[in-house]
């Protein structure tokens, strides 16, 4: 059940016990800032390496989940965990090819930072490790381990997805490395350890729903450990151990997460506490798109004269160009959903009577999920 559904109905249906009444996995949170200070520069923490070694000795299996969902090139400090955020929207800034850091909500931009403004460290940058690199690291640290990798590259061929899962289920591998596709609904009775690498990756995306999505992914991942008769353990590796999405997922506490997340959404004016209208504008002509966005925003500001609303942007919606078509987005925030509908209707009429928008595609999305 999504956070918005719970908010609207004020009803929470909880399933606190597993289907076969197994004990929940024991969850350990590892602060990767301390790992760095202790001289460990590996993506595998000392605790995770020790637990993986135990599994290999017991002939039990391990799943390593690299949390890259929604990854958008955010910049963080490995010394203190500080993430460079937009000063106006409380979402992370994304690094673009021109070296600038931009907010995909309001369009704010700044030059890329090389020194952490919080602690002064030069250990600041983008997270670059992928599943292939993780696989190589595991093989180096544990030469005796049989390792399978499951990601977009290894599942392109027909039936490859099923073959990898079948091989792991048949215990033809000791370790399965993968992205979010390995954590959803799979039951492997011999998996007693799950390692969640870079739990922060989905937490600091340029999306106000990043906390909710992180909580969902981490709780799903933790739930893969100990599905059989053996006790399960999970290790969450993070640079932000005190963030509520990390702490509550480690505790498997949805109620505590919900309370913190709703507080954040209310403070920032994001759904479901308030309503959001996303206006997506696209065109093959970049200059025309820029001009159209400017006129459209100016009109929307005038059109909301009797409506209590904020018009934000235009900004880049994550991916700026798809199939040679350029994209922008304008956001409108207001407490009253009906006001959004009124403003949307007025804007549509304005677009219809202005031929300058004929070579642009304009879409409206209420409270985008």
Residue locations for each model-derived region?
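Inter-lobe coupling/hinge segments of SF2-like helicase ATPases
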Residues: 1, 5-290, 302, 318-320, ...
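Short helix-terminating capping/connector loops at secondary-structure junctions
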Residues: 58, 229-230, 306-307, 355-359
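Short amphipathic alpha-helices in soluble, non-transmembrane regions
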Residues: 292-298, 342-350
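Short beta-strand elements
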Residues: 148, 303-317, 358-365
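Short, low-order "capping/linker" segments at domain edges
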Residues: 320-333, 366-369
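Generic C-terminus detector
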Residues: 337, 345, 349-369
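Conserved beta/loop motifs at nucleotide-recognition and modification sites
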Residues: 64, 302, 307, 355, ...
